[in-house]
C-alpha cells in the first residue's frame, strides 16, 4: 500500500488558470486564486484506505476526510458542494469522481498518485486537466 502521509509542498503547476476558466470562474477571481494557490501546503494523514487531506493557501484552507470506496461530501476547486467517490485506479493512484449536489457544471474529478516519491495531483473539468506536482517537506 502506498504511503501518501506527510506534508507536501508544490514543485510545479500546469493549467490551473485554464481549469478555473473551464469551471466558469471570472478573470478577477482567477487572478486572486492563481496567486493564492501558488504555494499551497498539503498535509495528508493516512490509515490504510482512510484519508485526511488538509490544503492551506493564503486565502483558503480545505479539509477532507474520506474512506476509499465510500461516498463523501466535499467542494469542487471553485467551491461548489459535491458528492465524491474515491477509488483505487491502480496500486499508487486514487481517482475521485465528483457529482454536483445542486446546479449544473462540467464533469469534475481529481486524482492523487505517488510516483518516485512525488505526489502528482490532477484536477479535471470536462477535458481540461490541471497537473500539480508536490514533493515532501
Swiss-Prot record:
Sequence motif Nuclear localization signal, residues: 21-31
GO molecular function: retinal binding; retinol binding
Cystine pairs: none
Pfam family, one: Lipocalin
Keyword field: Cytoplasm, Retinol-binding, Transport, Vitamin A
Main location per the UniProt record: cytoplasm
First and last residue of the signal peptide: none
Binding residues annotated for all-trans-retinoate, in chain numbering: 132-134
Compartmental location: Cytoplasm
Gene Ontology, cellular component aspect: cytoplasm
Free-text comment about domains: Forms a beta-barrel structure that accommodates hydrophobic ligands in its interior.
Function of the molecule: Cytosolic CRABPs may regulate the access of retinoic acid to the nuclear retinoic acid receptors.
Family: Belongs to the calycin superfamily. Fatty-acid binding protein (FABP) family.
Protein name: Cellular retinoic acid-binding protein 1
Upper lineage: Eukaryota, Metazoa, Chordata, Craniata, Vertebrata
Underlying gene: CRABP1
